[in-house]
Amino acid sequence: MVQIVISSAGAGGLAEWVLMELQGEIEARHSTGLAGNLLGDLHYTTEGIPVLIVGHHILYGKIIHLEKPFAVLVKHTPGEQDCDELGCESGTRYLVTALIKNKILFKTRPKPIITNVPKKV
């Protein structure tokens, strides 16, 4: 039988993340990829509607509550140093760092923000 040890972060409570769902594809300008880079600005209107601004485009979305929340896990495999201090009988552990209970769905096409483009003279 396989046992997976999962523990939570403690009494401080877990962070709550939000999942963002976009239609289509997002490409980076450079070949470095999107990891670790700023995607855009997320704002909320006074009515609570999420607004995502990416470059010169704006997207309007809606918040959807997930029926089954997701847990964000961090895998911790004990190294030789951990084995000496704590003993190696426990094996791999997973730590719950955050919960995802809501997602923001952007299902419409992005609208351009720039309205007037200067013409060449």
UniProtKB/Swiss-Prot annotation:
PANTHER family this protein is in? CHROMOSOME TRANSMISSION FIDELITY PROTEIN 8 HOMOLOG, CTF8, CHROMOSOME TRANSMISSION FIDELITY FACTOR 8 HOMOLOG (S. CEREVISIAE)
This protein's encoding gene? CHTF8
Give compartment(s).
Nucleus
Q: What is the lineage of its organism?
A: Eukaryota, Metazoa, Chordata, Craniata, Vertebrata
- Spell out the protein name for this chain: Chromosome transmission fidelity protein 8 homolog
Give the family, as the similarity comment puts it: Belongs to the CTF8 family.
Gene Ontology MF: a single term: DNA binding
The protein's superkingdom reads: Eukaryota
Assembly and oligomerization: Component of the CTF18-RFC complex, which consists of CTF18, CTF8, DSCC1, RFC2, RFC3, RFC4 and RFC5. The CTF18-RFC complex does not interact with the Rad9/Rad1/Hus1 complex. The CTF18-RFC complex interacts with POLH. CTF18/CTF8/DSCC1 associate with PCNA. CTF8 exists as a dimer with DSCC1.
The record's Gene Ontology cellular component field reads: Ctf18 RFC-like complex
What Pfam families does the record tag this protein with?
Ctf8
Q: Which InterPro entries match?
A: Ctf8
The principal localisation class reads nucleus
Biological role: Chromosome cohesion factor involved in sister chromatid cohesion and fidelity of chromosome transmission. Component of one of the cell nuclear antigen loader complexes, CTF18-replication factor C (CTF18-RFC), which consists of CTF18, CTF8, DSCC1, RFC2, RFC3, RFC4 and RFC5. The CTF18-RFC complex binds to single-stranded and primed DNAs and has weak ATPase activity that is stimulated the presence of primed DNA, replication protein A (RPA) and proliferating cell nuclear antigen (PCNA). The CTF18-RFC complex catalyzes the ATP-dependent loading of PCNA onto primed and gapped DNA.
GO biological process annotations for this chain's record? DNA replication; mitotic sister chromatid cohesion; positive regulation of DNA-directed DNA polymerase activity
Q: Which UniProt keywords apply?
A: Cell cycle, DNA replication, DNA-binding, Nucleus
